[in-house]
From Swiss-Prot:
Gene name of the encoded protein: ZSCAN5DP
GO terms for cellular component: nucleus
Zinc fingers typed C2H2-type, residue spans: 352-374, 380-402, 408-430, 436-458, 464-486
Keyword RNA-binding among record annotations: no
Comp. bias (Polar residues): 158-167
CDD domains: SCAN
One GO-annotated biological process of the protein: regulation of transcription by RNA polymerase II
Protein name as it appears in the record: Putative zinc finger and SCAN domain-containing protein 5D
Pfam families reported in the protein's UniProt record: SCAN, zf-C2H2, zf-met
Domain of life from the UniProt record: Eukaryota
Amino acid sequence: MGQCRNWKWGLESFDFSINRRSSAPGQLESASQMRESWRHKAGRRMFSCPEESDPIQALRKLTELCHLWLRPDLHTKEQILDMLVMEQFMISMPQELQVLVKVNGVQSCKDLEDLLRNNRRPKKWSVVNFLGKEYLMQESDVEMAEIPASVRDDPRGVSSQRASSVNEMRPGEGQASQELQTLPRVPALSRRQEEDFLLPETTVMKSAPKALRPKPTLEKDLNVDREENTGLTSPEPQLPNGPSVVGAKEGKEPKKRASVENVDADTPSACVVEREASTHSGSRGDALNLRCPKRSKPDATSISQEGPQGGATPVGNSESPGKPEINSVYSPGPAGAVSHPNGQEAKELLPFACGVCNKRFTCNSKLAIHMRSHTGERPFQCNFCERCFTQLSDLRVHQRIHTGEKPYTCDICHKRFNRMFSLKCHKRSHTGEKPYKCKDCNQVFTYRKNLNEHKLIHSGEKPYKCPKCLRAFRRPETLKYHQKTHQETTAPRECEG
């Protein structure tokens, strides 16, 4: 019988999916059309085929009922598919989720998915005894916690049989507390009862008697829910002694409640923390800074900055070297638009400075890797050719030359590469992309290396010199070819040019 009641509830709660559809674009169905649509739907649900009946006639009858319900002459294939999927979804879901879907007026699977995704956070539900019947309702925690005494003392026909009527449940999980599981099934509401009772739910809850008031433990539940909603993972810091802390110990709500009560359910957690932090100052503000969600770090970029010469010294927090200050983390901006700060701001965001070239870094590990370029240290050695590298990642890429491993494949010509960067550059031969442009002559190149060599033509620089004849060249390949001329002759000869 429990499954039967749940089945009926699912049918009636999904009645809106047909009645709210328009028979013509821009027109709502009339009351007679709504009743007719529901009659055909109910007839299809209650259809049964006796054993002695003709199965062909039963098939035709069932086809006719489904046609009258789905109306393929008025609805599209997507609408019909949504109707079938949502009906089965409503039949198999718990009652509290059926109420949530019906109150929000969901009419398509896409809207239903958005509703379920946005309602995964903990909600408060209550069982209300009204006119001898019990109803499952969703309520506002803060509004229930602050109902005026003059309003609470007026029962106005609401029964006070349930002393603890507020029970936590998660609609996305479809689980209720033990008290809700022992209650009888919520009766199906007609359309008129739904409009008279479910819609003005705040009015009914404001007039609730003392039996429906939250107990003092509700304050603790509200705090737990708010911490879960904001998604804070860091532990709560120990607050210093102050008026707000003393008021909280005595059972009084601190003033921060005023800044959280008016926050909408869809407000991002970061905005809630920022709004809460803006109402405090002094030591309380410092404590709230520790609760802010972790911001994204800047890219692995270094900024050249004038600084004192010497060893690698972190700038910023002198008490805890190797860790930047929490308050110095900046708000993340749009991807690809990271601005490079200067001066004091650069020291706060990039606290670790190189004492040789004054480049700055976000963490000490990146600085240690950079210092190897000055000291010449190469701690990672290849087991095959004994070649050394400054980073372990470079060693792993190099070892693919010996092992023949090429994990990256071009999806166009199926050519394989041992580095992702090589594959990225190779794809430009298929797409014709030339992202590097010369500022002097507007000539474009496929690779940065070719652009750098081209710039030497405009500057006239020749950085590669022959150690024997001191002749200079722009490209290293040309220098190697030139050096072969010295090896071919036993006696060195004077180079021309």
